[in-house]
Every structure is written in C-alpha cells, then in structure tokens.
C-alpha cells in the first residue's frame, strides 16, 4: 500500500467526520454517502472506514485527551479543526503502527488543506502537547 492511499483516506475521513459533526447523521449513512458519492480512486477504503468508525465511536474519549490542552472551550474550536484533532488523536492513541511524527504531519497537512489560515499551527500545538503527555 502506498502512503498516498492513507493520505487520501485521511482526507476523506476528515470530510466525513466534519459532515457527521455538523449533520448528526448516523455514521453508517455518512460512510455510505462518502463511499458512493465521492471519488475514491487510490483511497485506502479500509483505513478510511477505520478512521471514521474509530473516531466517531471513541469521540468522547478522544475529546477527553484533547480538551486539557485547549485554551478555549471545545465547542469554540472550528468543526474542521475538531475533525482533524480527533483523527490525529485516534491515530496517536490507537494506531501504534503510525509513527507520531507521521500522524502529526498528516494532521498539519489536513488543517492546511481544509482549515482556517493558521489552523495548522493550532492543531500542531495541541498534538505536540498530547504526545508530550504520553
């Protein structure tokens, strides 16, 4: 498997989690929508499914790991940054095969692609603190 397949899976997962957060729809429905309506060529679909399922089912646990490092209420964090932080925290916590530097770098790239202008700096700072605490 090429790393780019996982990168594409992460990009799709961020969009799906963002949609789930805003819509409140069932995760299975969000997954189905993304796999049928989005271009999935070159996407590691099983990794996409794991990220979506793992991040959504463990969101409360992930949020508990993220929140102590925030300087503002979690509900004030933009939905896209929340999605990126949740995915990266999932990888840092449950995917020991993913080096922490890779998880953080991928999250920074996702925040640059989808987030606010300096969102990647915010994401980087929070993830660095999470890693330092482990």
From Swiss-Prot:
CC terms in the record's Gene Ontology section: cytosol
Keywords: RNA-binding, Transcription, Transcription antitermination, Transcription regulation
Domain of life: Bacteria
A single GO molecular function term of this UniProt record: RNA binding
One example of a Gene Ontology biological process annotation: DNA-templated transcription termination
Disulfide bonding pattern of the chain: none
CDD domains: Terminator_NusB
Xref: HAMAP family: NusB
Entry's family note: Belongs to the NusB family.
Function: Involved in transcription antitermination. Required for transcription of ribosomal RNA (rRNA) genes. Binds specifically to the boxA antiterminator sequence of the ribosomal RNA (rrn) operons.
NCBIfam families in UniProt: nusB
Name used for this protein in its record: Transcription antitermination protein NusB
Organism of this sequence: Shewanella loihica (strain ATCC BAA-1088 / PV-4)
């Amino acid at each position: 498997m090429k790393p780019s397949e996982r990168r594409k899976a992460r990009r799709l997962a961020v969009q799906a989690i963002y949609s789930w957060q805003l819509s409140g729809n069932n995760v299975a429905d969000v997954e189905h929508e993304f796999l049928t309506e989005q271009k999935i060529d070159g996407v590691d679909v099983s990794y996409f499914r794991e990220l979506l399922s793992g991040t959504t089912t463990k969101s409360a646990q992930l949020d508990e790991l993220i929140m102590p490092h925030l300087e503002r209420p979690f509900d004030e964090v933009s939905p896209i940054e929340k999605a990126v932080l949740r995915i990266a925290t999932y990888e840092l916590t449950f995917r020991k095969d993913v080096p922490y530097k890779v998880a953080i770098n991928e999250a920074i790239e996702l925040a640059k692609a989808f987030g606010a202008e300096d969102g990647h700096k915010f994401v980087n700072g929070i993830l660095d603190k999470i890693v330092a605490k482990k």
